[in-house]
């Protein structure tokens, strides 16, 4: 199945994405990851005010098939979490790049944060190899 990977996002090889708007980062998971997980039944995210660091899990997503840790593409402080997705995680797949976002962070260092992320084309090539 072919998925959309918006060009204005950056991706991790673990399937999280980030949209950076100045010092505010919106984080979610890709359509490919959602398809691989299947029906999502539970989502655990950090509280507003908590710090998240690149390379350290900030929560997890649970489906009928698996439980996966979530990793932030950027470091920062949580300024908002998508309570609608926590309450109804099965809706994440309806609009993963819009209403299905997970966290918003105030980024520590916006200029250097995207160094270890993939462009949409790089990510598309990677997931086509996994499918």
Curated annotation (Swiss-Prot):
It comes from the Bacteria. Gene3D superfamilies: 2.40.50.100. Its cofactor is (R)-lipoate. The modification N6-lipoyllysine is found at residue 65. InterPro entries: 2-oxoA_DH_lipoyl-BS, Biotin_lipoyl, GCV_H, GCV_H/Fam206, GCV_H_sub, Single_hybrid_motif. SUPFAM superfamilies: Single hybrid motif. Keywords: Lipoyl. Residues 24-106 form the Lipoyl-binding domain. Binds 1 lipoyl cofactor covalently. GO terms for biological process: glycine decarboxylation via glycine cleavage system. Pfam families: GCV_H. Disulfide bonds: none annotated. GO terms for cellular component: cytosol; glycine cleavage complex. Belongs to the GcvH family. The glycine cleavage system catalyzes the degradation of glycine. The H protein shuttles the methylamine group of glycine from the P protein to the T protein. The glycine cleavage system is composed of four proteins: P, T, L and H. This is Glycine cleavage system H protein. It comes from Gloeothece citriformis (strain PCC 7424) (Cyanothece sp. (strain PCC 7424)).
């Amino acid at each position: 199945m072919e998925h959309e990977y918006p060009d204005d996002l950056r991706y991790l090889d673990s399937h999280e994405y980030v949209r950076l708007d100045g010092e505010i980062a919106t984080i979610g998971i890709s359509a490919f990851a959602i398809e691989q997980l299947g029906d999502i039944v539970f989502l655990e995210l950090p509280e507003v005010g908590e710090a998240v660091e690149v390379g350290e899990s900030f929560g997890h997503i649970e489906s009928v098939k698996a439980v996966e840790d979530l990793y932030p593409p950027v470091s920062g402080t949580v300024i908002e979490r998508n309570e609608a997705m926590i309450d109804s995680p099965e809706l994440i797949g309806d609009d993963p790049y819009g209403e299905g976002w997970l966290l918003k962070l105030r980024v520590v260092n916006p200029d250097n944060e995207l160094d270890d992320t993939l462009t949409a084309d790089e990510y598309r090539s990677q997931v086509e190899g996994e499918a």
